[in-house]
C-alpha cells in the first residue's frame, strides 16, 4: 500500500507542482504600463535589454528569470521592463517619442531607449544590459554581463 501511495504521489502530484511553479513569472510591463504604474505607486524600475541573437540574454531568460526567488524579488520590489533592442516600434514615454532610427540604415539597429540608458563612453553597445532606475527614473546601477541568480539578487539590493 505504501508503494502504491508513493507511486500515485510521484506520477500525479509532482507534475502538477511543476506546472504550478511554471505559471509564477516575472510581471513584465510595457513602457506605457510602466509610466501609468509609476504614477499610481512609485517603485524602482528593473530594465532588461536583450536581442534574439544574444546567447547570454537567452541564458538569463531561461535560467535566471525562472528562479522563484528572483521572480518574487522583482515582482514585489520593482517594476520590470524587458525590451528587444532591435524593436522598431515608436514608443511614447513621458511625452517623448522614441524610435529605432538605426533600423533604417543598419542591420541590427538599436532602439533609442537602450542607447540612452545602456550606452557607455569608450565602449561599444553590448548585451545583455540590465539597468536599475530609482522610482524617480534616476540611474542607480547598470550591468553589462551574464549573471547568476545570486549575483542578480545581490545587484537588486
Descriptions of predicted regions:
Residues 135-157:
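Thiol-/selenol-based redox modules, centered on thioredoxin-like
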Residues 1-23:
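Bacterial Sec-dependent N-terminal signal peptides
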Residues 52-59, 128-131:
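C-type cytochrome heme c attachment motif
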Residues 70, 79-127, 134-136:
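Thioredoxin-like thiol-disulfide oxidoreductase module
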Residues 41-55:
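Short active-site neighborhood of thiol/selenol oxidoreductases, capturing the structured segment around
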Residues 51-56, 64, 85-90, 137-138:
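Solvent-exposed loop/turn segments at secondary-structure junctions
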Amino acid at each position: 500500500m505504501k508503494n502504491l501511495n508513493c507511486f500515485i504521489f510521484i506520477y500525479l502530484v509532482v507534475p502538477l507542482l511543476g506546472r504550478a511553479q511554471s505559471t509564477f513569472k516575472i510581471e513584465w510591463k510595457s513602457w506605457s504600463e510602466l509610466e501609468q504604474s509609476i504614477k499610481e505607486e512609485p517603485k524602482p524600475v528593473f530594465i532588461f535589454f536583450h536581442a534574439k541573437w544574444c546567447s547570454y540574454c537567452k541564458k538569463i531568460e531561461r535560467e535566471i528569470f525562472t528562479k522563484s526567488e528572483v521572480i518574487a524579488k522583482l515582482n514585489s520590489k520593482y517594476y520590470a521592463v524587458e525590451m528587444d533592442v532591435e524593436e522598431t516600434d515608436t514608443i511614447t514615454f513621458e511625452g517623448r517619442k522614441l524610435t529605432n532610427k538605426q533600423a533604417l540604415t543598419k542591420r541590427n539597429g538599436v532602439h533609442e531607449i537602450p542607447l540612452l540608458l545602456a550606452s557607455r563612453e569608450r565602449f561599444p553597445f553590448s548585451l545583455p544590459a540590465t539597468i536599475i532606475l530609482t522610482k524617480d527614473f534616476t540611474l542607480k546601477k547598470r550591468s553589462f554581463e551574464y549573471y547568476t541568480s545570486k549575483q542578480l539578487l545581490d545587484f537588486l539590493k
